[in-house]
Structure formats: C-alpha cells, structure tokens
Amino acid sequence: RSEVESWQRLTRVLTHEIMNAVTPIQSITQAYIGSKMVKGTPLEEGILAIYDTSRSLSAFVESYRKMTQLQTVNLEEIDLQRLVTNLQTLYPNLTWHVDLANVQTLRADASMMHQVLTNIVKNAAEAGAQNIDISARRTDQCTQLRISNDGTPIAAEVAREVFVPFFTTKRTGSGIGLSLSRQMMMAQGGNLALAERAQAGYHTTFVVTL
C-alpha cells in the first residue's frame, strides 16, 4: 500500500509540474491564433499545431490526475430509487426498465455511485442503446445492481480490456470512465464487473456489487 501511495504522490507532483509548463503555452498560442499578425501567415499552421498538441497533453495529464485522486469516501444510506430517477432525468430519450425489488437504500458514497452509474449509462447511450434495464437484489452477503443495455455488443477481445486505464475504442474517448468507476466501487468496498453473459434480451450487462 505504501508503494502505491508513493507512486500516487509522484504522479501528482509530475502532473502539477507538467500542467505548470503546458498551461502558459496553451494560453499564449490561443491568443496568437486570432491575432492579425498570425492569421493567414505561414506561422498560423505551426501555432495551431502547438496549440492542439498542448491541449491534447493537458487532457492526457488531467486523465492521469483523475486516476490518482479519488475523493474521500463518505459512506451513508442513500435512496436507490432517487439515484435511478436522477439517471432517468439525465437520459430521457432512453426507455427504462427498473426493478429494484425490496432494495430501497444502499450504504455507499452518493456522489461516487452517481458517477459510476452515469458512466455506465453514458457508454450505453454512446453505443446506440435504446433500452436500459436496472435490477437490484440483496443477499446476506451483498447488494447487487445489474445494468443492462441493448446497444452495440462489446466484442470479446474488447471485453478483456474495458477496465484497463486509457483503453478506448472511441475516436474521442479518454478511456478512463470504466476504470475510474471500478476504482470508485473498490474504494467503497465493492466492485464493478462486466457480466460474461448479458441479461436475456440485452447485449451488455454490468454488475455493481456492494
């Protein structure tokens, strides 16, 4: 654990130093892009390249920062129905099928749970899903949420990589959503997994365990 914490501290220092160097480059080149002395001249292409590269580097460093700076976990009894209702409000164009059985509350971090479920549903929507099914079951050992969607199925070779940091099949994706979500679940004493077999009638099922 101490080794992991040391690496996290080192990463925080490095990201801070890199951002200190990149931010002024990004600001200065952005200012020059619209100026008369650059626009339409041979300099414009070079400055645009520097600006785009600095923006990409900033986004990459920010992704690393998110991976190493999980907020403090605040476990409390949260209203599961309210959590799901908030998701439905965020994605009104999806058709929702909800079966929470007798699971009314979860002992979890509210903001983390919201982000985890939002990441899962966001990915489903981006994969072309039209239907989302959320079911909850409680046993003596744990509470399990299953989130299923009918979007484009995840290929077997991709399924092995979905929780790997920075792995993405999207042209503009950062590849940290599911990895960060799993970290959040583990920080709460739970887990996030991709089911080997999707629920009947759906293409993909994620399982949240607490």
Where are these regions (language model features)?
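Conserved catalytic submotifs in the C-terminal HATPase_c
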Residues: H97-T105, S111
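Detector for a conserved hydrophobic position within an alpha-helical segment of the HATPase_c
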Residues: M185-M186
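Short alpha-helical Gxxx[C/S/T] motif in the catalytic ATP-binding
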Residues: G177, S181
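Short conserved segment of the HATPase_c
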Residues: I154-P165
